[in-house]
């Protein structure tokens, strides 16, 4: 009986996957980019203001938008302001989000063809949200003013997709990949 249930489940999965893929007649599903949320948290004691300005400039160059800045702590001593903790955040829509994802793929991935963004069971296509975390920002060092700056920031990227032409599909045990041309693919 278990074998029969497993067989039926596999048939259902293949049916849903084929239905999803047949809308575009290729391996690319009809899921479009809605918006991208990007947050950077920089925690390093006793960093001066010019270093924060460099990080903000870096953030603007990466995203093409002016970020929201939140300062949690700062100290002033002998006319020198030093920062304890600050956060940057920006939200990109439509074309700017696509440009950012393309830049992320080319800069962050290097020679690899794709990046696994999500791999889990029972993925709901109607509320698909992908997250990626950068722990090492040394790849962005060439666009910094000071080459010796120590980047210990963490960059969090949340990607929200919206479905086109699919009502309420649900896939089980499939991986989602983001390709260099910003194509969204589903594979077993």
Curated annotation (Swiss-Prot):
Note: Found in a 14.5 kb cluster region located downstream from rpl11 gene and upstream of orf796.
Domain of life of the organism encoding this protein: Eukaryota
Motif extent (L5-specific motif): 62-77
Primary site of residence: mitochondrion
Keywords attached to this entry: Mitochondrion
GO cellular component: mitochondrion
Cellular localization per UniProt: Mitochondrion
Name the record gives this protein: Uncharacterized mitochondrial protein 30
